[in-house]
């Protein structure tokens, strides 16, 4: 919740800047978590909610800040369902190279910062354990939007360099860090403008990430597919 408070406070001064555009959006979503952890398949069903604020300055600079919460369960090979929760804070800073008036599309390369924290509670070896994960990443991406009347269509493609990817199981004295430094994400949004201020948006997001233990033999790969629906307001 501290991330959400930070997001809301940061949006207040942006709405008062003249000759610029601000939008705030609330999204609800579902996520299917796939992939594998060693020889074991990953099978997760998560719900999510997200709040995102984006500001376009008159000098073509773009700043976006979002907070997302996910909760649900992963099903283990023995049929047990875990209790999974995560929080993600994502900052994007970009520069609009081309706008719809000049090019027919908006093109914005960006970088930023991502902080991800997760907790997965389960029973293993006859004990209740908690697997805690902490990840920090720096994304490098490009966002493209095209427009047709009230409809707009986009694509957001990014690679993120992980400065930290650590998983801990305190009760078992397990502390693992990944030597795999990159993750991949692509998202496809479709937006419909209801009126001058209000819009609806649907989005598909696919992410891929790998965890390779620096000192052991453990290897895991996540392949997540997420669908979100949201409503937004422009200022």
Whereabouts are the PLM-identified features?
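Outer-membrane beta-barrel transmembrane domain signature
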Residues: 97, 120-199, 205-213, 233-235
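Transmembrane beta-barrel strands of outer-membrane/channel proteins
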Residues: 24-32, 65-69, 109-115, 142-144, ...
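Outer-membrane beta-barrel "beta-signal"
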Residues: 93, 192, 222-235
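Repeated loop/turn-to-beta-strand initiation elements of outer-membrane beta-barrel proteins
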Residues: 22-24, 59-65, 100-107, 150-154, ...
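Flexible, solvent-exposed loop segments that connect beta-strands
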Residues: 34-43, 69-86, 114-135, 161-180, ...
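Cleavable N-terminal export/targeting peptides
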Residues: 1-25, 235
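Hydrophobic, lipid-facing positions within transmembrane beta-strands of outer-membrane proteins
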Residues: 24, 47-51, 87-91, 136-142, ...
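Short glycine/proline- and aromatic-enriched beta-strand/turn motifs that initiate or cap beta-hairpins
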Residues: 17-77, 149, 232
């Amino acid at each position: 919740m501290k991330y959400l408070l930070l997001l809301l406070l940061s949006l207040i001064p942006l709405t008062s800047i003249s000759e610029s555009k601000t939008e705030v959006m609330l999204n609800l979503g579902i996520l299917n978590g796939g992939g594998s952890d060693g020889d074991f398949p990953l099978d997760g069903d998560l719900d999510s909610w997200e709040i995102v604020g984006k500001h376009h300055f008159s000098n073509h600079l773009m700043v976006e800040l979002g907070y997302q919460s996910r909760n649900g369960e992963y099903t283990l090979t023995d049929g047990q369902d875990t209790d999974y929760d995560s929080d993600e804070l994502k900052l994007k800073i970009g520069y609009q190279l081309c706008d719809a008036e000049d090019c027919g599309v908006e093109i914005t390369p960006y970088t930023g910062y991502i902080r991800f924290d997760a907790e997965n509670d389960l029973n293993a070896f006859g004990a209740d354990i908690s697997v805690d994960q902490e990840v920090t990443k720096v994304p490098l991406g490009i966002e493209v939007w095209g427009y047709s009347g009230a409809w707009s269509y986009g694509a957001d493609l990014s690679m993120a360099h992980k400065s930290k990817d650590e998983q801990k199981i305190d009760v078992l004295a397990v502390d693992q860090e990944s030597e795999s430094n990159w993750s991949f994400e692509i998202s496809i949004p479709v937006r419909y403008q209801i009126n001058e201020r209000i819009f609806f948006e649907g989005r598909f997001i696919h992410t891929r990430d790998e965890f390779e233990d620096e000192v052991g033999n453990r290897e895991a790969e996540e392949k997540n597919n997420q669908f979100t629906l949201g409503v937004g307001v422009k200022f």
